[in-house]
Amino acid sequence: MSSGVREACESRKYNAIVLLGGGEPGFIESREIARPYGIAVTACGFSQMHFATMLGNRFSVIDLSEVHNMHYYDLVIKHRFENRCASIRNINYPLPRPPYSGESQVHLAKNKVMRGEFSEIMESAIHESVSAIEEDGAEVLILGCSALFWMKPILQKRLAELGLEIPVLEGYSSAITLAKAMVDLGVSSSGLTYPGPHDKKWRRKKLF
């Protein structure tokens, strides 16, 4: 990841870099690498959480497995949204990982839904979304794993049919839109948050 980001920065061909993965592997390192080049770096969870807090008071995450739930919990803490995150709701359809194999149940569900067929996974996502709203106080929903991002328009439509006018965000469009906004604003990352190894000025004290 870091070598690819460095190569992209050194090529001077890009104004921004978008990391497409719900779990944000290498995001902090990529921002640190890109900052001296003035290149914005965005990632899915980071972008969704920031947009979500502009749209409502609290958001909930619709996610697919225990292991990813806990990883996403760490992202919520890392990005300092623990006071704005109402809950992480788990539909419990893990992606196949070694030593397990076979086609993803989520991928099969997507094909079913696109054919207009019933999908238990889709219904689980709707059920957990309603619970997040009615029980947890969520006012915005975000999708945790990139394997679920295809659900956004269907989830939005089904919730609206239930009378729940709530924004649903997915990571790809959020990360790309934020990257464009940062380029338009002419900003990347703060040099005080991501300092270089030999910055000209240094701070004697940091307050958090």
Name these PLM-found stretches.
Residues 2-51:
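Glycine/small-residue-rich loop that forms an oxyanion/phosphate-binding "nest" at active or ligand-binding sites
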Residues 19-30, 64-68, 144-150:
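Gly/Ser/Thr-rich loops at beta-strand to alpha-helix junctions
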Residues 53-93, 180-208:
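Short, glycine-/small-residue-rich phosphate/pyrophosphate-handling segment
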Residues 31-55, 157-176:
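Short, acidic/small-residue loops that bind anionic groups at enzyme active sites
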Residues 75-144:
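Active-site rim beta-loop-alpha module in soluble metabolic enzymes
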Residues 9-10, 118-133, 194-208:
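Extended, charge-rich low-complexity interaction segments
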Residues 11-21, 138-146, 169:
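Periplasmic-binding protein-like
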Residues 1-16, 131-137, 156-158, 165, ...:
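Metallocofactor- and cofactor-centric catalytic cores in central/energy metabolism, strongly enriched
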